[in-house]
UniProtKB/Swiss-Prot annotation:
Annotated compartments: Cytoplasm
Pfam families found in the cross-reference section: RecX_HTH1, RecX_HTH2, RecX_HTH3
Primary location class: cytoplasm
GO cellular component, one term: cytoplasm
Protein name per UniProt: Regulatory protein RecX
The family this protein is said to belong to: Belongs to the RecX family.
Entry's Gene Ontology BP terms: regulation of DNA repair
Organism: Pseudomonas putida (strain ATCC 47054 / DSM 6125 / CFBP 8728 / NCIMB 11950 / KT2440)
Length: 156
């Protein structure tokens, strides 16, 4: 049975339940509350209050999302795009990616090792295949080129 979200208390309770499961961005939390029947006039003040109390934090959400998606083998470009689609500000995303402690070259090498067993491409076709795979995963082309040609990635 779904509760009716027609009071600030009900909205706050539902928002806190969602935040207890995992971090959410403001846009995502607003969308979920709307789907449950809450009105914007009631949602906004409650989300403001949760943010003031430190229970709703875009910075924590960004950090959590970056850690999760990079751990799943995705690079910074793919993560940036996914966060933009979730309604977060590009400047905040870029700052969070810069401040993340993810070693992108190491992460890319791990993904490449798992997929291609560490076999560098022997012909243009296999090089194109490996390049497409890593680019789709969101890793920068210059980093991909360095990995596939066997050059040192420690500059990243």
């Amino acid at each position: 049975m779904s509760a009716v979200l027609d009071t600030p208390v009900a909205i706050r309770r539902t928002a806190m339940d969602l935040l207890a499961r995992r971090e959410h961005g403001r846009v995502e939390l607003t969308r979920k509350l709307r789907q449950r029947g809450a009105s914007d006039e009631l949602i906004e003040p409650e989300l403001d209050r949760l943010a003031e109390e430190g229970l709703l934090s875009e910075a924590r959400y960004l950090e959590s999302f970056i850690r999760y998606r990079s751990g799943s083998g995705y690079g910074p470009a793919r993560i940036r795009e996914e966060l933009c689609q979730r309604g977060l500000a590009r400047a905040d995303i870029d700052q969070a990616l810069r401040e993340s402690e993810v070693n992108w070259s190491e992460r890319m090498r791990d993904v490449w090792q798992r997929k291609f067993a560490g076999q560098r491409p022997q012909d243009p076709r296999s090089r194109a295949q490996q390049t497409r795979f890593l680019a789709y995963r969101g890793f920068p082309m210059d980093m991909i080129g360095r990995l596939l040609s066997g050059r040192d990635l420690d500059d990243y």
